[in-house]
Amino acid sequence: MANSPSAKKRAKQAEKRRSHNASLRSMVRTYIKNVVKAIDAKDLDKAKTAYTAAVPVIDRMADKGIIHKNKAARHKSRLNAHIKALGTAAA
């Protein structure tokens, strides 16, 4: 356990940041899950709306370092591919 005052402060800061980052990661997962649910329901309009809402959140979390930029790009690419496939299947 931390003994010096500075080590105690750093431990407190690390815990605070960890819980805040966990909350942000959870938020990103929720946005992604909303898009996936709309895709599974084959609701193109709802999927596009959810995707439009999710993209800026995913980008913002990648900029902050909450998720890796490649992971953000991978999520966006795969979700968009599913939505496009849903659009061609509906047409």
Swiss-Prot record:
Q: Where is the signal peptide?
A: none
In what ranges is there compositional bias, type Basic residues?
7-20
Which GO terms fall under biological process for this protein? translation
Any idea which GO molecular function terms this record carries? small ribosomal subunit rRNA binding; structural constituent of ribosome
Under InterPro entries, the record lists: Ribosomal_bS20, Ribosomal_bS20_sf
UniProt region (Disordered), positions on chain: 1-25
Pfam families named among the record's database cross-references: Ribosomal_S20p (PF01649)
User: Which SUPFAM superfamilies does the protein's record reference?
Assistant: Ribosomal protein S20
Q: What does this protein do?
A: Binds directly to 16S ribosomal RNA.
Which NCBIfam families did the record assign? Answer: S20
Q: What is this protein called?
A: Small ribosomal subunit protein bS20
Q: Which organism is it from?
A: Azotobacter vinelandii (strain DJ / ATCC BAA-1303)
Gene it is expressed from: rpsT
